[in-house]
């Protein structure tokens, strides 16, 4: 009787170990699969994250002159500043227009050229010297290429406006490659680099 109980105990123990071994094996496989999946997800996320911060010159769909035309249909003012940046999670042009006593801002989606947002506000410091026509200056793609000759990154943002310190119209360009960022200021008439700084 005692030997039968011992034998039963051994069989149960063996079954328990066998089951446990299989469970461990399954757990290990599941864990490995989960880790692999997470690794895949992480790399996808970081890739997407990286891409969402910058845009390649060739991927910009709407040209600045078209964005300005669209903005002027929405608000009848003189062009004061144009900038290209991430707005509400989308690449967009922010067009600032001015007229006596008022300023307007129109945001244009770069992907489809449609208006995302527009606003106006009372403004007393109207300054005719800050108004310009985009076509009077070097096109933005020429400016970006000049900056890229010095630092081969993708576009993080750029803008064109009158720089009061320089006393002239200037393109400000931010390029990014990985974690490195470079900021440029270029003369809008000549494309001469006025400033080139590493942004840490």
Residues of each region from the PLM?
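Sec-dependent N-terminal signal peptides
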Residues: 1-7
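N-terminal, intrinsically disordered, polar/charged segments of Gram-positive cell-envelope systems
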Residues: 3, 13-81
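Residues within alpha-helical transmembrane segments of multi-pass membrane proteins, especially transporters
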Residues: 9-11
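A short, surface-exposed interaction/processing loop segment used at functional sites
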Residues: 27-40, 112-132, 188-200
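Short, non-transmembrane alpha-helical segments in secretory-pathway proteins
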Residues: 49-85, 130-161
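Exposed beta-strand-loop-beta-strand "reactive/processing" segments of non-cytosolic proteins
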Residues: 74-108, 156-186, 197
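Short secondary-structure transition/capping segments
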Residues: 125-135, 165-172
């Amino acid at each position: 009787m005692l030997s039968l109980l011992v034998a039963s105990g051994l069989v149960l123990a063996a079954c328990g170990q066998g089951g446990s071994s299989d469970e461990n094996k399954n757990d290990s496989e599941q864990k490995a699969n989960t880790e692999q999946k997470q690794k895949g997800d992480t790399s996808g996320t970081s890739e997407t994250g990286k891409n969402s911060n910058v845009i390649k010159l060739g991927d910009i769909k709407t040209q600045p002159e078209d964005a300005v035309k669209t903005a002027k249909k929405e608000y009848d003012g003189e062009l004061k500043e144009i900038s290209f940046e991430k707005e509400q999670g989308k690449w967009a042009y922010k067009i600032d227009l001015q007229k006596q006593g008022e300023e307007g801002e129109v945001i244009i989606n770069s992907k489809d050229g449609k208006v995302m947002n527009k606003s106006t506000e009372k403004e007393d410091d109207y300054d005719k010297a800050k108004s310009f026509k985009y076509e009077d200056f070097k096109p933005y793609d020429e400016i970006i290429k000049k900056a890229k000759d010095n630092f081969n990154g993708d576009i993080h943002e750029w803008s064109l406006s009158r720089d009061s310190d320089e006393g002239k119209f200037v393109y400000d360009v931010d390029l990014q490659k990985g974690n490195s960022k470079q900021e440029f200021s270029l003369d809008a008439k000549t494309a001469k680099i006025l400033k080139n700084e590493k942004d840490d």
